[in-house]
From Swiss-Prot:
This is UPF0246 protein RSc2009. It comes from Ralstonia nicotianae (strain ATCC BAA-1114 / GMI1000). GO terms for cellular component: cytosol. PANTHER family: PEROXIDE STRESS RESISTANCE PROTEIN YAAA, PEROXIDE STRESS RESPONSE PROTEIN YAAA. It comes from the Bacteria. HAMAP family: UPF0246. The lineage of its organism: Bacteria, Pseudomonadati, Pseudomonadota, Betaproteobacteria, Burkholderiales.
């Protein structure tokens, strides 16, 4: 069983990493191709492309300029410790044990516009490049064209040791589109998190994002390799709703946040 998460736009490179253990991304040379494409853009062009403010555009232009194929303790940080935001607030990787992180290293992957797919302990230099960005590149009109089957094949290589391979999709729709179901040699299960509001259950973005991180943490702490055990997930009041679920879409609900 492999869990996939989306990355986060918010990054934390101020807090020193609490462990030194690290790996390197699998697709550094591919990332370098995208960086070269991004370096050709002015801050104004970056701002227009990514729909971000002028200060953010300048910040990211500088990040692209500084990016290197050499990943060091000074210019990078383990991905799961560098990403911030709602999902990663739920995951709270800074409070996971070293053994927890090693389990995550085997069972968790983070999809990325720049890096393709990351292990939790892969060193990562700061960047902003959302998967849905329409960045024309040597591979085509956007990042889905650029990554092609690469991400899916990397996941297949990881899943091939499982007797009944299952990919648990805790990523957003934008990011999961980089995974090609027809190429993937695994069953896909997508947990959905709903909260009670206005007299009915609905997906509330902030809560749903946090719940994805909470479920990833639950799987790590309980060493879950059989996805069926995820149905026991009960963090922060969620419970599996069998009546609203099917084989591919598992719904978890709670009455009060």
């Amino acid at each position: 069983m492999i869990i996939v998460l989306s990355p986060a736009k918010s990054l934390d490179y101020d807090t020193p990493p609490r462990i030194k253990t690290h790996t390197l991304p699998d697709f550094i040379e591919r990332s370098a191709v995208l960086i070269e494409t991004l370096r050709k853009l002015s801050p104004a062009q970056i701002g227009t492309l990514m729909h971000i403010s002028d200060p953010l555009a300048v910040l990211n232009a500088n990040r692209y300029a500084d990016w290197s194929t050499e990943f060091t303790a000074d210019n990078s940080k383990q991905a799961v410790l560098a990403f911030d935001g709602d999902v990663y607030g739920g995951l709270d990787a800074n409070t996971l044990s070293a053994d927890d992180l090693q389990f995550a290293q085997q069972h968790l992957r983070i999809l990325s516009g720049l890096y393709g797919v990351l292990r939790p302990l892969d060193r990562m230099q700061p960047y902003r490049l959302e998967m849905g960005t329409r960045l024309a590149n040597p591979g085509g009109k956007d990042l889905y064209a650029f990554w092609g089957d690469d991400v899916t094949l990397a996941l297949n290589a990881l899943l091939q040791a499982d007797d009944d391979p299952v990919l648990v999709n805790l990523a957003s729709e934008e990011y999961f589109k980089v995974v090609r179901p027809k190429v993937l040699k695994a069953r896909i299960v997508t947990p959905v998190f709903e909260d009670w509001k206005g007299g009915r259950y609905k997906i509330i973005s902030f809560y749903a994002k946090r719940a994805r991180g909470l479920m990833a943490r639950y799987a790590i702490e309980h060493r879950i390799a059989d996805p069926r055990k995820l149905k026991h997930f009960d963090a922060e009041g969620y419970a599996f709703a069998a009546e609203a679920s099917d084989d591919e879409r598992w719904v978890f609900r709670r009455k009060a946040a």
